[in-house]
Amino acid sequence: DLYMVLRDAFRGGDTHASRFYAGAVVENVESYDRSSSYPDVIVNCQYPITPFYHVGAASLKDVKYYMQKGRALVMRIAMYNVRLRDKYSPVPYIPKAKTQSCVNAEIDNGRVLAAEYLEMAVTDIDLKIILDQYDADNIVISDMWQSRSGYLPRAYRELVKKYYVQKTELKVVDGMEAYYDKS
């Protein structure tokens, strides 16, 4: 059960085009390069550090309690009459492809704008974003697991910082591009 909910909840980085500009050629735009989000998250964010404990069905109040206590959560949820709070939200969070059921849904570029009903597996991080972006008449948590959160081991975080510094130093050295690209 836990393995399957973890598999269902898994999603990679949230990369998506603004639904208002997808497929359009936009001139005179700017961008910037983040040197790397992954080392930052590995060093500065907390992760589940104990085995997940099965809680079972829970109320939204229970979930919010666990979240306030800094617990890592994974759960199966059902949402009724789901809709975006802001119809102009450029990148809605819920991907239809990650739902186990999605009934009478309005989909734009693969993302759920509204649905009569949907089921999906989510983490506490997903749920925070969903609660911020969407309204629903009812949210039912049919199954939930929790783990204590904490930082990854100090030695590992220090190693990540060391490699990050070495990588960024290569970036500015002429003739080292091949080594930088490998890192």
Where are these regions (language model features)?
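Conserved acidic
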Residues: D1-S183
